Regions:
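One-carbon transfer enzymes
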Residues: 1-127
Length: 127
């Protein structure tokens, strides 16, 4: 069975939907961890209620984005991560996470991507 780690910043409604879909076997995987960048996010309460481990980590506690993401990758190393789902994670993912989990990250995005200048989407982190 595949292991999913979900990243969220807010209410966690998408996180909860993913967990429930896994529990109902709609998705053949297990959510093994929630990574949350906001200590007051409602997603943390959802994780506790659903029995999912939560790793709360604030980028404000680090000197650089690299240091922040390196700490996350060190945490993830203790899991067999098959997929990272960015579900309401309100940060642009940097090179440290992208290179370590290349081809294993998907994003749910509330924006209409055509609203971004197509020639600049990758540069600004929209895709």
């Amino acid at each position: 069975m595949k292991n999913i780690v979900v990243f969220a910043s807010g209410s966690g409604s998408n996180f909860e939907a993913i967990v429930k879909a896994c529990n109902k076997k709609i998705i053949d995987a297990n959510v093994v961890l929630l990574v949350c960048d906001k200590k007051d996010a409602y997603a943390i309460k959802r994780a506790k209620r659903l029995g999912i481990e939560c790793f709360v980590i604030s980028p404000k506690d680090f000197a650089s984005k690299y240091d922040y993401e390196k700490t996350i990758t060190l945490k993830l190393a203790s899991y067999r991560v098959d997929l990272i789902c960015l579900a309401g994670y309100m940060r642009i993912v940097g090179e440290e996470l992208l290179s370590k989990y290349e081809g294993k990250i998907i994003n749910t995005h509330p924006s209409i991507l055509p609203a971004f200048n197509k020639s600049n989407c990758f540069k600004i982190g929209a895709i």
